[in-house]
Design a protein with these regions (language model features):
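Short, well-ordered beta-strand elements
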Residues: 34-39, 190-202, 220-226
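Short, polar/charged alpha-helical segment
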Residues: 48, 52-60, 64-73, 201-226, ...
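Ligand-binding "clamshell"
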Residues: 98, 111-123, 255-267
Length: 290
């Protein structure tokens, strides 16, 4: 009886080992897939935007109805076993070499010498709802300096600059570009005054440089203050340090106001920066779609 029991136990142990090795072999295949990492922005609106871009490519499926509030926790289907790294948006170009792919905002891509129109493996269409805006503290919407700034940024000169400079990496969304001036503004009364604007270095500060020349025609000085993050430009508008900012899209502003109890409003949409998926360790989408 003991001999029979020993034989049975030996058989069970052998079978268990075989199954364990088989399982390990299967796990290595899954691990190979799961080793593919995609870095995405860690702020609410840009993370959702990145995930929606990946969903459009059939790489993931999000829960119904999550929209612009989606996070990695809302991924319902992940057939390619993608591992997501949530990274501060400004740092995404810096981590690109350490991950397989990264979804990067165009302003940070451009600042890192990437060309979104050429280097992105996947890019949003120019009809993206995430237009970059000029924003001011509530109550300053009708300030003549704000109106003068908006008119300059909404000019044909600026729209043409965007088209020529960025070749589709940044796209003007101004429907009817004007001559750069607002007929309702008394420019003579603004002569010698300064309008201060917080902006990211690229492309916003570059675009503002064109508007600066337009305002200079009316002897208005444009003080462009550059920031490399997504928080300070709103804080300095809220506390009155600067009059306006130009660096963000409307969904981000709405989320920022809700989280920080700030009172900043959009006064004009100027351009859109299509979000792109860039290759880091991978040079194509083959590893994701294979």
């Amino acid at each position: 009886m003991k001999k029979t029991l020993s034989i049975i136990l030996a058989a069970v142990l052998t079978l268990s080992l075989v199954l364990s090795f088989a399982s390990c072999g299967q796990g290595s295949s899954d691990d190979k897939k799961s080793s593919l990492t995609v870095a995405v922005p860690n702020d609410t609106t840009n993370e959702a935007r990145a995930l929606l871009l990946l969903q459009q490519q059939g790489l993931i499926k999000l829960k119904d109805g999550v929209g612009i509030t989606a996070t990695v926790l809302d991924i319902e289907e992940n057939p390619h076993n993608i591992k997501f790294n949530e990274v501060e948006a400004a740092q995404l170009p810096n981590v690109l070499k350490d991950v397989d792919y990264a979804v990067i905002n165009s302003n940070y891509a451009i600042a890192a010498n990437l060309n979104p129109a050429k280097d992105a493996l996947v890019i949003e269409g120019s009809s993206s709802a995430y237009s970059n805006i000029v924003a001011v503290k509530e109550g300053n919407e009708n300030d003549p300096l704000v109106k003068a700034l908006v008119a300059a940024l909404s000019s044909k000169k600026v729209a043409d600059f965007i088209t020529e400079k960025y070749s589709g990496s940044v796209v003007s969304v101004v429907d009817n570009p004007g001559d750069g001036f607002d007929s309702s503004v008394d420019y003579a009364s603004l002569s010698g005054k300064t309008v201060s604007v917080a902006a990211s270095p690229a492309p916003h500060a570059e675009i503002l440089a064109v508007a600066k020349d337009i305002l200079a025609e009316k002897n208005i000085k444009l003080d462009i203050q550059e920031f490399s993050d997504y928080v300070v430009p709103n804080n300095v508008v809220e506390d009155g340090t600067v009059l306006a900012n130009y660096f963000q899209h409307k969904p981000y502003l709405d989320d920022f106001n809700a989280e920080n109890n700030t009172h900043i409003v959009s006064v004009a949409a100027i351009h859109v920066e299509p979000l792109g998926l860039y290759g880091g360790k991978q040079s194509s989408l083959d590893a994701l779609k294979g």
